[in-house]
Each structure stands twice: as structure tokens, then as C-alpha cells.
Design a protein with these regions (language model features):
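Metal-cofactor-dependent catalytic cores
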Residues: 1-199
Length: 199
């Protein structure tokens, strides 16, 4: 597995970044809606080896039990499960590269969103409801029904208007914050791989 860079992502990463206004965010909706529906492109892979840590990868190994191999999903656990174990329906986080490009404003800040995969593809509820399967390199992922929403870290990094934007009714319909998925077939995926919706 090839690692391009290891980055420590703090909760309050910069002091000189201007967060976008509601109007500026809404102006990006048309571009987001133009994302391809059936075959997209994987633009960034991020592994989270520890809390507030990010590793930018050129490829990732996807495993049925671990999700992204080396990621802290399984070790981190979840407050949404009765026993605090990792949530099986939130194993993989995927975000639209068009959305993160809008809210982050700079590609060097994409990793701050905290997702593992950033794809140029329509992630909306209409195009990718729960149960949709995606060919991810040699692996296959299945979209789950667990919602993926902006939180306080998202506010700190991208602003309160960005959080309102992704968590709004329209934002939820378009899955602007992204989608959750799980591995149903293990394999390897690389930056630049085509991501295909399986029918």
C-alpha cells in the first residue's frame, strides 16, 4: 500500500480560511448536480490511522472485517451501537469530490472532511439509495441506510453555513455530506479508478 503523505488534522486547522456564505454554497449546486450518475472517478483516498490523523494514499485495500485496512473505524467504535463496537453500516465513508471542492475551497483541505473516499459521482438519494452496489476497483461496496451528516468538526473546518448546507432537506436528498457504505467483496482500489454503479 502506497502512502503519499501523513497529515495531522487538528480540530481547528487554520485561522486564515474564510468560510463560504449560504449564497456562495448554493451557487455551487448546479455543478454538483452535473456529476456522472453511473460511472465516476475516485479522486482521493484518505486513511485515518488514529484520532485526528490522516494518511493520503494512492491505493487502499478493502476488507470485509476491517473496511479500509489500517483505518481506525473498527478500533474507534461507535456511540450508535449498544456495546460501543464499530457500526457495521458505517464502515466506509464516501463524499462527492464536487461538494468537498466547494466547501474546502482548496484541494489541500479535502482530507479535513474526514471521509475515506472522494469520488466524482452523483451520490444523491435518487441515484444511490441504500442497497446500491458500487464497483470500487476490484472490491464491491454496498450503500447503507445510515445517514452521513455534518457535525461540530465539520463546522470548525468549513463553517456553520456549510454544515447547514449539507444537513438541509435538500442536502440530505443530494447526500451532500456523503454516504455510508460497507464492503461486500474485498479488493484493492486506486486513485484514478473508475467507480461503477452495478445494476
Amino acid at each position: 500500500m502506497s502512502t503519499l503523505n501523513t497529515i495531522t488534522a487538528t480540530l481547528f486547522p487554520e485561522t486564515d480560511v474564510r468560510h463560504l456564505t449560504k449564497e456562495e454554497l448554493e451557487a455551487g449546486l448546479d455543478e454538483i448536480r452535473r456529476a456522472p450518475k453511473d460511472e465516476g472517478l475516485l479522486q482521493l483516498i484518505v486513511r485515518r490511522p488514529g484520532v485526528e490523523q490522516r494518511e493520503i494514499l494512492t491505493e487502499a485495500h478493502l476488507d470485509l472485517e476491517q473496511g479500509v485496512v489500517g483505518d481506525n473505524w473498527k478500533r474507534r467504535g461507535s456511540s450508535m451501537t449498544d456495546d460501543g463496537s464499530a457500526h457495521p453500516e458505517m464502515q466506509i465513508n464516501i463524499m462527492s469530490s464536487r461538494v468537498v471542492a466547494l466547501v474546502a475551497q482548496n484541494r489541500n483541505r479535502w482530507h479535513l472532511a474526514g471521509d475515506q473516499f472522494y469520488v466524482d459521482m452523483d451520490l444523491s438519494e435518487d441515484n444511490m439509495p441504500a442497497g446500491t452496489r458500487l464497483e470500487f476497483g476490484t472490491a464491491v461496496l454496498e450503500v447503507t441506510a445510515e445517514p452521513h451528516l455534518g457535525c461540530r468538526k465539520f463546522v470548525a473546518r468549513f463553517g456553520v453555513e456549510a454544515m447547514k448546507f449539507v444537513n438541509s432537506e435538500l442536502g440530505r436528498q443530494l447526500h451532500l455530506r456523503g454516504i455510508n457504505a460497507k464492503v461486500v467483496k474485498p479488493g484493492v482500489v486506486r486513485v484514478g479508478s473508475a467507480i461503477r454503479k452495478l445494476h
